[in-house]
Amino acid sequence: MNVSKYVAIFSFVFIQLISVGKVFANADERMTTFRENIAQTWQQPEHYDLYIPAITWHARFAYDKEKTDRYNERPWGGGFGLSRWDEKGNWHGLYAMAFKDSWNKWEPIAGYGWESTWRPLADENFHLGLGFTAGVTARDNWNYIPLPVLLPLASVGYGPVTFQMTYIPGTYNNGNVYFAWMRFQF
């Protein structure tokens, strides 16, 4: 190899290493913002929320029929939360909820949720949201060992009533579950 190839390879590697430093710096900033949002929601909530589970649906393309025939898809339970809207109009919430899972066993979950919120109509009460939740759950079939979760969130709402949902990804006969609930804001 001639010198110009070595210079090109060295330059490429050097640029990649510089980029990694920027990524970690941005990750630190995002983590600080994440912690501050949780603290502010806990310390300065605007609303108290009631959570009522509405539906659990197992994606039929990802399950054997005999399994889905046995699964519970009508979770019942409830939860409580604290929430606020930030200066950009985005939703932040802390919550704890318990519901009957696919096996009709109790599953608790607690965490933080964030949604970027849009108000596409002239009526400001109507809102759409897209974001994430990060928390901890525990399941009977995992001996109630605490399991971390990081899941997408989506919602449609009017005023203080919101239909909020997530999708739990998975493999064949495991995961691939749509879960939704009503959130009433007081």
Curated annotation (Swiss-Prot):
Keyword Signal: yes
Signal sequence, renumbered to the chain: 1-25
Main location: membrane
GO cellular component, one term: cell outer membrane
Residues marked Role in the phospholipid gating (site): Y172
Record site: Role in lipopolysaccharide recognition: K67
Subcellular localization(s) per the UniProt record: Cell outer membrane
Domain of life: Bacteria
Gene3D superfamilies to which the protein is assigned, alphabetical: 2.40.160.20
Family (UniProt): Belongs to the lipid A palmitoyltransferase family.
Protein name: Lipid A acyltransferase PagP
Native source organism of the sequence: Shigella flexneri
Lineage: Bacteria, Pseudomonadati, Pseudomonadota, Gammaproteobacteria, Enterobacterales
